[in-house]
Design a protein with these regions (language model features):
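Bacterial N-terminal signal peptides
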Residues: 7-18
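Sec/Tat signal peptide C-region and signal peptidase I cleavage site
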Residues: 20-24
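Extracytoplasmic and endomembrane cell-envelope/extracellular-matrix remodeling and assembly machinery
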Residues: 25-39, 50, 120, 130-257, ...
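Short helix-capping/linker turns of helical repeat alpha-solenoids
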Residues: 44-52, 58-65, 77-84, 93-95, ...
């Protein structure tokens, strides 16, 4: 069961626009993590949620679970719900970190904060397996997690980075101009990216960026394999069991090992 659930969640982490409904009224923007030129142009440095999630995936797939855990925590600092779900799974299974079911529940509760179905299912599975003592500790631990990693604290951090990095890339504080072109060094010289693609508002406007993620993760493909109770959600899943905590927007950012980022996100599985 552990292997199936991890495989499902890892697969979900690798999916972006492919999970969107085919009848969506507004077509999704191109997946930036599937475009080598966009990654080379510095897209990931401006999107730390995706950047550190990709690092976490690479470390996890390489079997370096301890470092993967650190990268998923850092992505979580920037409101990345899939990474919060991976932190929970690793705590639940004892991968790269000591097994801690109570803390795992708190992280999965956090991952389910926006009502994403896959994470809600895992959260309820965790809860049903906890002892009464672990349930009490999960709620206590969860308050501190929400203060640091909940949307009230993490989304303003991400919004600050998106706005700052967009100004840097365009070279102007007036915002994006439609005729901006981006040049990326390649094997045959410089290659050009159309600015209208790179600067799609859904990548840079904080509210639209969250809505883009919501459209991907609200009903993703995770939790749709045979992992028992994950598939059995009540019609109205309960809201968070953890009390509201005062957000700590200025909390210290988790630290991660240095890694070569030149090919980050460009290596595909065989």
């Amino acid at each position: 069961v552990k292997q199936l659930r991890n495989a499902a969640l890892i697969a979900g982490l690798c999916l972006l626009h492919s999970t969107l409904p085919v009848n969506a009224q507004t077509p999704p923007p191109p997946d930036p993590t599937e475009d080598r030129l966009m990654l080379s142009a510095g897209f990931l440095s401006a999107h730390p949620d995706l950047r550190f999630r990709l690092h976490g995936l690479e470390e996890f797939k390489a079997g370096r679970h301890e470092d993967a855990f650190k990268f998923f925590q850092r992505a979580s600092f920037y409101a990345d719900k899939p990474s919060q779900g991976m932190v929970a799974e690793m705590l639940w299974n004892g991968q790269g970190v000591a097994k801690d079911p109570a803390l795992a529940y708190a992280w999965m509760d956090l991952a389910a904060e926006r009502g994403y179905v896959g994470f809600l299912g895992l959260r309820e599975r965790y809860w049903s397996a906890l002892s009464e003592a672990d349930r009490e500790r999960a709620i206590r631990e969860g308050e501190a997690l929400y203060a640091k990693y909940g949307d009230a604290a993490a989304q303003p951090r991400l919004a600050t980075v998106l706005r700052r990095e967009r100004r840097k890339i365009t070279g102007s504080r007036t915002g994006f101009a439609g005729n901006v072109q981006i040049y990326v060094p390649g094997p045959g010289g410089f290659e050009q990216i159309d600015g209208s693609k790179f600067f799609d508002e859904r990548y840079w406007d904080p509210k639209q960026y969250q809505a883009w993620h919501d459209s991907i993760w609200t009903k993703p493909r995770i939790g749709r394999v045979s992992v028992g109770d994950v598939e059995q959600l009540p019609e109205a899943a309960p809201s968070s069991r953890i009390p509201v905590a005062r957000p700590e927007v200025d909390a210290a950012e988790p630290q991660t090992p240095e890694r070569d980022e030149s090919g980050l996100g460009t290596q595909k599985d065989d």
